[in-house]
Amino acid sequence: KRNYYPWLSIMLCICLNANAQSIIEYDIVLSGGRVIDPETKLDAIRNVGILNNRIAQISTEPLKGKQTINVSGLVVAPGFIDLHVHGRSNVEQEYQLHDGVTTALELEWGIEHLGKWYESRKGKALINYGASVNWPFERFKAIGKYQKAVDSLMQLTINGEANIGAMTNTILRAANETITADALNQTLVNIKTSLNEGGIGIAAPIGYLPKTNPNEMYQAYKLAGELQVVVFSHVRNPDIISIQEAIA
């Protein structure tokens, strides 16, 4: 005697699932787009139901929505994460949004006065944001004699200025200086402080400070190893020795 109950249960579940999709009213439905999901390898035409700002359903069946957007001929995909941006205001973020970027991170150069910058972006940013610790700035700050310039950079940070040229030109005034042991120790303290303020690793763009004593860079990498944080390196020179310095 055949037992049809398991098959009947499966069919009922399929029917109930399809019926539930048609009953639920999603906040937004993206209809008919080419859905690409790198995690599951999905690459097909689907309808996407969004509920409470989250993707609640991806289906071949029509979905009901308070707002339905026909995205036929367009790609629907997770937002891109850009790891190397220098723009830090909503002007740049608007362009990034149009490119499909939903997270923009300043990791190669980092951001000065990092804690203050995070505060200045709270509730204002259009997309997700973050930054690494700006090693050249923490070094510049530790030298001591540039306090007036450090303070002036604070105002640029709070105002959300995106003038990377003004910032780098200010900080790089100390690029060729050999710093004291005390200043080096203070640099490491400054880096730790900024990491605690939310720094996503340490930016080490030594290519902009190529005359820096190798021990300075070594100590920064050593600190990163002790704290188990990532280093984003713009190497000293375009050669093998500089690569070895970064990975030693």
What residues fall within each predicted segment?
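Hydrophobic/aromatic beta-strand patches that form the interior of the parallel beta-sheet core
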Residues: 30, 67-69, 81, 105, ...
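Metallo-beta-lactamase
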Residues: 79-86
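Bacterial Sec-dependent N-terminal signal peptides
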Residues: 1-23
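Active-site beta-loop-alpha junctions enriched in small/polar residues
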Residues: 86-88, 109, 134-138, 207-209, ...
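Histidine-rich, glycine-flanked metal-binding segment
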Residues: 22-29, 35-77
